[in-house]
Amino acid sequence: MIRVTCGVYSLLNCLYLPQVSYVIRDEVEKYNRNGVNALQLDPALNRLFTAGRDSIIRIWNVNQHKQDPYIASMEHHTDWVNDIVLCCNGKTLISASSDTTVKVWNAHKGFCMSTLRTHKDYVKALAYAKDKELVASAGLDRQIFLWDVNTLTALTASNNTVTTSSLSGNKDSIYSLAMNQMGTVIVSGSTEKVLRVWDPRTCQKLMKLKGHTDNVKALTLLNAECLSGSSDGTIRLWSLGQQRCIATYRVHDEGVWALQVNEGFTHVYSGGRDRKIYCTDLRNPDIRLLICEEKAPVLKMELDRSADPPLASKRTTVNPDIVLSSGDYENDCSTPLSPICSQPDQVIKGGASIIQCNILNDKRHILTKDTNNNVAYWDVLKACKVEDLGKVDFEEEIKKRFKMVYVPNWFSVDLKTGMLTITLDESDCFAAWVSAKDAGFSSPDGSDPKLNLGGLLLQALLEFWPRTHINPMEEEENEVNHVANGEQENRIQKGNGYFQVPPHTPVIFGEAGGRTLFRLLCRDSGGETESMLLNETVPQWVIDITVDKNMPKFNKIPFYLQPHSSSGAKTLKKDRLSASDMLQVRKVMEHVYEKIINVDTESQTTSSSNNEKPGEQEKEEDIAVLAEEKIELLCQDQILDPNMDLRTVKHFIWKSGGDLTLHYRQKST
């Protein structure tokens, strides 16, 4: 038995380096952005639950044929939702996700009640025993855990510990799971190509069934009979009593990924990679129907058992009363069939999924292309879409927006959910500095300060977290100084002072290995519970920038400065210089003019100028103008634009190892 504490996973339990992610999206995502992995139907309320690869569970009214069927979204997962089961007569929903968690939901109100974190890898499958209100979960960590649903629904903030049993013995990742209604038998399918059978009451393994030649992707179980669908393209019927396969159905041309059976276990509905859905009579396998053909592989099916008559009996050729003949048999139906349903009764449309992206070289904007071939332009810093460009040439748009500017990488992009997920790691989050002017921001005092993009973004993401409003070291002093005259609230500085991100933006604190520690919306970080959980999960490198306001150091770049060979000047001592990588070429030109060229001029004119130094008479702005008029700076014999910075020169022109070398010469008159 294992005791599990539900809720947030503390930083103290981190196995990998912590990171921060956020999703750029609309406030309400009504449509499935990616594949639908699982379905559950509540016939009493005419509600369909869909679990998406966009991390969202959605609720639909299946009676709304003409009006918008969307009811609500259930959002708390951060990766693909792989499976869902309805329990307690539709009151409770259990979900399994690639974020390694199992979540318990109030299905009627649509909120997450608790989170189970026992799995160490993707959770791929769930199984439900209706008579016992027992749920099993399994995944890529090869573990199966058993959960009492009534215990899960009774969990509270103070009573947040639950006991679970585990079934060990699988040698490979588990992709499918089935349990009978009485909760006395569990069957698992895996990449081991076998079925393993357990008694959940004793946690003892009963048998191992061999026969498939590829991953077992789908299972269904009734009493002592089990059906399995595999990526090897076959459906197999197993007798648990005889511990062997008693029938093999070769209905599909490719892998079988989804199975459903009628209540009498006489007909099986199957779908998979070949996009076809068949109904096969288990007792007479020569009788089969091609129900329909989809436009994409079938990931999951749900049979509406309340339909009268059921789909399989709409054709007189299907006889539900046929009894299985004695003996084993194997069918191979190769005769082409025409689908009996050319059009679906109802279609719940999905949304476009982002399938391609390009980070522009300003390291702030992204171009994306979706499944409808629409191109969009995004601002990573402000976490928003800037413009829909429509069906335009993606590569041409990239070329149009190219700028001769180099900014270091400071974030990574993931398209797994069909939306833009931006991830910040401590190793490079603070690598990118830009000037406020270049970023399009104005400073109140008219100056042009240097801004750290990662730092600004973190401050914006946690703008509503009270701990970031006042440095705890200064809080007491501020209260003494300002409470008396009511000015404290006005003096609290929130965010970064330049921009805000949309308050609905989901922020995710997790591990580099994929495990999620905590997910919340930006606007919710001011809540008492959320604020407390942030104290436990926000990593120190984020605290440093958002709470303590400790800005990272500027990036330095070493370089050498030498006269150009065409100038005829003697080569100087090769001193290694160092400056901010954002230093503009014009500043180096000013240095050359003032400290090198002007010094030579002074030594030649001292005797005839009454000891007046030209440098003393020139204002700073005059030096800048004169430097550009008289000095050229070169790299690899290419004349440099004064507006370039050193990092751009090194990236686009120097293009080689070792320290950057710049040459100067006077312009020919």
Cite the ranges covered by each PLM segment.
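Extended, C-terminal alpha-helical/coiled-coil scaffolding tails that mediate protein-protein interactions
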Residues: 495-669
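Intrinsically disordered, low-complexity acidic/Ser/Thr/Pro-rich linker and tail segments
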Residues: 1-40, 44-64, 311-345, 492, ...
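Short C-terminal beta-strands that terminate individual repeats in beta-propeller domains
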Residues: 24-31, 69-76, 112-118, 138, ...
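WD40-repeat beta-propellers
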Residues: 57-62, 102-105, 126, 144-149, ...
